[in-house]
A protein has these predicted regions:
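Hydrophobic anchor residue at the start of the ABC signature
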Residues: 144
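Conserved signature/switch motifs of ABC ATPase nucleotide-binding domains
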Residues: 129-132, 150
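Conserved ABC transporter NBD signature motif
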Residues: 61-73
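Helix-to-loop junction immediately C-terminal to a conserved catalytic motif
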Residues: 53
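Short coil-to-helix segment of the ABC ATPase nucleotide-binding domain corresponding to the Q-loop/switch region
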Residues: 90-98
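Conserved ABC ATPase "signature" region
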Residues: 97, 101, 108-126, 178
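The feature captures the beta-strand-to-loop junction immediately N-terminal to the Walker
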Residues: 38-40
Length: 252
């Protein structure tokens, strides 16, 4: 499913004064594409995801899922945050079950999906665990499973690995790359991590500081699976880093 941002402008009111967070964002994601957005803190990256998820509204422009304007929270879009946001009184299984709360599924299909995504996210043996018994990485696996269990067409990821240690982060990045290859999900990833963006994305969108505008879009012409240590990937990392530094240096 394609996702289109058409001339999006967004303001917040701060101390009675309008603050422009996003300005004239024009971006399209093709079906099955993974696009990473990178930029300085406060440039509106997470706001863009909230708009696509129907959690927030825009003053100007429109967002389309396929040819359908986003009005309210779309059924075929899932949003995963940096914090797992698991309910502490629910087991891993029941936290994942929440992702299907509004779906009209048979009990057998609900259980089949839970088992499938437990396996996909490497959570076998943790089905009956409580959130306080999980490491940060395992909790984030549960959050991603909850986001996937409704079988969305579009997955929005808001720095999902930002709070994890380096090894766990790389493991979950590799798992996401595998999931992306196994499905036709359209994925929009917000990150501060240049290596993560280049390792995962088909294109990297570099944002300028607030008000957030698209400074540059860089295609990542690397085949999957990707080697983090390859010369080609390191060159792409350098190109994205340079574009990011240039965007930060521009007076807006």
């Amino acid at each position: 499913m394609s996702l289109h941002f058409q001339h999006i402008t967004k303001h917040f009111i701060v101390n009675g004064t309008p603050l422009t967070v996003l300005q004239d964002i024009d971006l399209s994601l093709h079906a099955g594409e993974l696009v990473a957005i990178i930029g300085a803190s406060g440039c509106g990256k997470s706001t863009l995801l909230r708009l696509a998820a129907g959690i927030d509204t825009t003053e100007r422009g429109r967002i389309l899922i396929g040819e359908r304007p986003v009005r309210g929270i779309p059924d075929d879009v899932s949003l995963v945050f940096q914090e797992p946001r698991l309910f502490p009184w629910l087991t891993v299984t029941d936290n994942i079950r929440l992702g299907m709360l509004n779906l009209n599924l048979s009990p057998a299909e609900v259980e089949r999906r839970i088992a499938h995504y437990l396996q996909m996210m490497g959570l076998e043996g943790f089905a009956d665990a409580w959130p306080h018994q999980l490491s940060g990485g395992m909790a984030q696996r549960v959050a991603i499973a909850r986001g996937l269990v409704s079988t969305p067409r579009i997955l929005l990821l808001d720095e999902p690995f930002g709070a994890l240690d380096a090894l766990t982060k790389q493991q979950l990045q590799a798992r996401l790359a595998e999931i992306r290859q196994q499905t036709n999900l359209t994925i929009l990833l917000v990150t501060h991590d240049v290596e993560e963006a280049v390792f995962l994305a088909d294109r990297v969108v570099v944002m300028s500081p607030r008000p957030g505008r698209i400074s540059r879009i860089l295609p990542i012409n690397l085949t999957y699976p990707r080697d983090r240590t390859s010369t080609a990937l390191l060159e792409q990392r350098q190109a994205v880093s340079q574009a990011l530094h240039l965007a930060d240096a521009v007076e807006v």
